[in-house]
């Protein structure tokens, strides 16, 4: 098969003293996200999508939150590792579509910087990377500003040999 599709989803609640990092970009906000790593919920969802497309499990399998080696880990390093696994299997990113679900903070001012960061980490043309944000109209935990959820879908294409 020459193409594979992967879907990733992740959620983190607000809290703690870490800065809010989304898609590799520090986003000004009152608080960060609670997590074993740096809490970059965007990169976690993308990593899961890549691993899913390659039938390699999920980030919990590769970077368990019970392993002290990953305490405070830079999620960009984790993402690049997951992408390298795909490259090792002969696949490259075809395109990526990310949806950030959050009532706050407003994401529009940060979308382009996130796309640029993802383009660099995934060694891909920025035109193959889409990031968008939505709210839940004040419904549910994201609507109550308790946390952020992210969905990511990747299309991975066999790289020419």
From Swiss-Prot:
CC cofactor note: Binds 1 divalent metal cation per subunit.
InterPro entries per the UniProt record, alphabetical: MECDP_synthase, MECDP_synthase_CS, MECDP_synthase_sf
UniProt xrefs under SUPFAM superfamilies: IpsF-like
Entry EC no(s): 4.6.1.12
Cofactor: a divalent metal cation
Site label Transition state stabilizer, positions: 36, 135
Binding residues for a divalent metal cation: 10, 12, 44
Catalytic activity: 4-CDP-2-C-methyl-D-erythritol 2-phosphate = 2-C-methyl-D-erythritol 2,4-cyclic diphosphate + CMP
Residues holding 4-CDP-2-C-methyl-D-erythritol 2-phosphate: 10-12, 36-37, 58-60, 63-67, 102-108, 134-137, 141, 144
Gene Ontology molecular function: any one: metal ion binding
GO biological process: isopentenyl diphosphate biosynthetic process, methylerythritol 4-phosphate pathway; terpenoid biosynthetic process
Tree of life domain: Bacteria
Pathway entry: Isoprenoid biosynthesis; isopentenyl diphosphate biosynthesis via DXP pathway; isopentenyl diphosphate from 1-deoxy-D-xylulose 5-phosphate: step 4/6
Keyword flag Metal-binding: yes
Keywords per UniProt: Isoprene biosynthesis, Lyase, Metal-binding
Gene3D superfamilies noted in UniProt: 2-C-methyl-D-erythritol 2,4-cyclodiphosphate synthase
Assigned protein family: Belongs to the IspF family.
HAMAP family: IspF
Subunit structure: Homotrimer.
Task performed by this protein: Involved in the biosynthesis of isopentenyl diphosphate (IPP) and dimethylallyl diphosphate (DMAPP), two major building blocks of isoprenoid compounds. Catalyzes the conversion of 4-diphosphocytidyl-2-C-methyl-D-erythritol 2-phosphate (CDP-ME2P) to 2-C-methyl-D-erythritol 2,4-cyclodiphosphate (ME-CPP) with a corresponding release of cytidine 5-monophosphate (CMP).
Protein name, as recorded: 2-C-methyl-D-erythritol 2,4-cyclodiphosphate synthase
Organism this protein belongs to: Shewanella loihica (strain ATCC BAA-1088 / PV-4)
